[in-house]
Amino acid sequence: MKNKFRKYILIILLLSSSFAECDYAIGDFNNDDVLNVLDIIALVNNIIDEDEFSIVFDLNFDLVNNIADIIILVNRIIDSYPQEIAIEEIDYDFETLTISWNQSTDYGFEYYNINYFNIISQESEIIYTSSSISDTSINLLDFALKEQNWFYISVVDFLGCETSGNQFYYELPFKHYEVDDNGDVYDSEISVTDFQNSTDCQGCHESHYEEWSNSMHSYSMNSPVFFSYKNETLENHPEVGDKFCSQCHNPIAYLTNTNLEEYDSVESLQSSQLPNVIKEGIGCDVCHTTTSLSETIFTDNSGAANAMYKLYPGENIKFGPIENPLENGFHNSYYLPTYTSSNMCLPCHDLVVRDVEAEITFTEWDRIPGFSMFGGVACQVCHMPEKEDGTHDHGFIGADLDLNIPYMSNPEYEKVVNLMNAAVTMEFDVWGIQLPEIINSGDSLLVPLTVESITAHNIPSGTSFNRDVWVELKVSSNNEIIYSSGLLQNNSELLNYNDENLLSFKTYLLDENGDTTRSVIDAHDIINNSLSPYAQRFKQYNIHIPDNISGEISVQARMLFRPFSPDFILNHHPSFIENLPIYEMFVINSIIEVE
């Protein structure tokens, strides 16, 4: 709703500068600044009494003064503006734009204007003008249409008055389908054969392919953790569970109504006779056949899938963010500005279940004041950063890694570390209260801590209920810890959430009984302790300094991020526990003298 409101505001601004001004001096034959019956009398008298043609009285510019001019004037006195007409149909094949409209019958007609404006590129122009009243359609060749297009036709009369018809909204072509109450797709224009394997792209786009191969998009159908969740969801919700998962984790299977219920493991799916585009999970064509914007997934009480993708596969056109792409012998290329916007991450990265905002990374970004309207930092800036050669990284860097391999060996690990290091800052200061430089032994040490987000979505985000994010605080003397909160001995140790001083950013999903759950489809409520974009969280620790401490003490605070709470991994895939990383997002240290 908010996005639609923004669109309409922009539309009003664009329309406000597009109308022609009326010149009422034309037809005002008695010069009284009003079109009325006196002007009709003057025109009639001229036609009756004058033998010679007068251009002043020729309102339809046919070089004759006659009854037609009288009709035009009478019509305009009765109705101050030209007759309103409307665009009836628009068709586009990514080369030719065809527009048809109903014909004007206005007696004062001078010409049509077809006006075009685009929400994303903010283009606004008259794309066609015709002085023939009988024109009702036009074919515009090589017209590069974008997403979110608005058209309207206006009629201009002999006075220069302009009347605009209703706006006609036109999305780029995409293939349609319907979804039933169980989340199964039917009446689909999309087939499996419409999609190309990602390996087909490798020859020309080798670096993109290699990056994708190591990404979580590629991992979606190679993740034992995903299959554990899928099997549990399917067991508890046999009617809707399969498509609930595949609508995001395997969009091609979802869109082609390919049933994945029988495949309960990576091995069973990858060894099957299913097409490779389904085994790939989220391949190149899932994104690069997108032509229009999708919306957040809202799932009702049944849990049935209802993701709406707007794709145009199987037409040998690949869409992307490169303006004026070079021609090649393999496919047509088409530039769309949406590919640099956060909207491209819909529908998958925004899921609401029973009004519970379960996984809403896009919404978190969209709620930042001014971001979506005025072009804040898009998802791609951080998660698909531009490389030295001008192309963008297709590793889709995020918090998660392939748990099949040691995280230090994962080629994406350093990228994730760099991403985490750029997400938050911390300081020992809360509204001017700072750490002391000197303290007496036996006293209480007040440690003021401010954590500040410098990223454009919550921390944690996505499946935030799976993640552990917290502050580890240590106070040490001579390398011996005299106080700690959030300190773990290893990456697989469980956090002590009973520690009243633990500064945690944990999110919990609650089921219908109010118990915690990791099953998204069973979410009935949420406790969200995550850190909002560009927000701050404050904490003050009161720590007793023992009487026997002297010299210096060190205070260290670390913001830590574990992409998965280890209990689920230990219960389902214990062999992965050593591959579970903990990222250090930020660290600060201070030394205090003890007297």
Regions from the language model: what does each represent?
Residues 143, 544-550:
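Short, surface-exposed loop/turn segments at beta-strand-coil junctions that are enriched for proline
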Residues 48-49, 104-108, 157, 453, ...:
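Extracellular acidic, Ser/Thr/Pro-rich low-complexity tracts
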Residues 111-146, 158-165:
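Recognizes extended acidic, P/S/T-rich segments that occur
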Residues 151-153, 555:
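Hydrophobic beta-strand segments within extracellular beta-sandwich modules
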Residues 81-108, 145, 158-177:
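Pro/Thr/Ser/Gly-rich low-complexity, intrinsically disordered linker/stalk tracts
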Residues 19-86, 106:
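Cellulosome-associated attachment modules in secreted, modular CAZymes
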Residues 175-192, 209-236, 261-516, 520-522, ...:
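Primarily the internal scaffold of c-type cytochrome electron-transfer domains
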Residues 4-20:
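Sec-dependent N-terminal signal peptides
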